[in-house]
Amino acid sequence: MRPLRREMQIVFQDPYASLNPRKRVGTIVSDPMRIHNLGSRAEQKRRVGEILETVGLSPEHYNRFPHEFSGGQRQRIGIARSLALRPKLIIADEPVSALDVSIQSQMLNLLDDLQKELQLTYVFIAHDLGVVRHVSDRIAVMYLGKLVELSPAEELYTRPIMPYSEALLSAVPIPDPDLAAKRERIVLEGDVPSPINPPSGCRFHPRCRYATDVCKQLEPPLVDYGNGHLAACHHPLNVDQATLQKVAAATADSSTPAVAPPTQSR
């Protein structure tokens, strides 16, 4: 597993808790190389200096401690550590949620630049769809631990199929007050069910304004509506009649109906 782990690294959500306060920056960033026995100490130090410059810091920061840096700088250190082994995949777990809004855009731009420069693949975990839009090619929406929609990024924002995705997008702020006034704000009612004991059928049905009896009884499968856009919903939104009929025909022999009858589309 060790060779595989070199290719997968993580950037943590909290830039304060994820850095050891007793270690200097140089040690923090070089630890992955030391653990994997990559290079001599001199080579590791040179590599750390290069990485620090790549993420917008200075090699002079090598001997400083985490408490000497701001939150944004600490997150840059965390990103530098994730790059030490030249990974192919980086899992970014809410990497900007703990930062000031003024710093978030800088961090997103850095991640975007690194992705292009180093040919990285990100698994970007976030609850803010406004942030996700800037870094994603494909977006997966999850609810209570289940994948409910998977779509090319821009298509999700223009044509959400799952009602939960629709509600999430309605909460994304729009800077234009005229457009914001015309948009419907969907407020979900009720409490979020327990992930330990989720509802039967579709897990979203207790809070869904389109839910019917079939939603309470049967869990909808993930269905491909074309163009790589998949959703798990008995009453899909923004799907034309022809596509609904095609999907219904393809699943006619299934014991679990994939979608509601085409006449119920909206």
Residue spans for each PLM region:
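Short catalytic/signature loops enriched in Gly
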Residues: 1, 152-262
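Q-loop/switch helix immediately C-terminal to the Walker
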Residues: 14, 23-34
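Interfacial catalytic loop of ABC nucleotide-binding domains
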Residues: 14, 46, 63-65, 183
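Conserved ABC ATPase "signature" region
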Residues: 43-60, 166-170
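Conserved ABC ATPase signature
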Residues: 65-69, 73
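P-loop NTP-binding/switch modules centered on Walker-like glycine-rich loops
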Residues: 88, 95, 99, 103-181
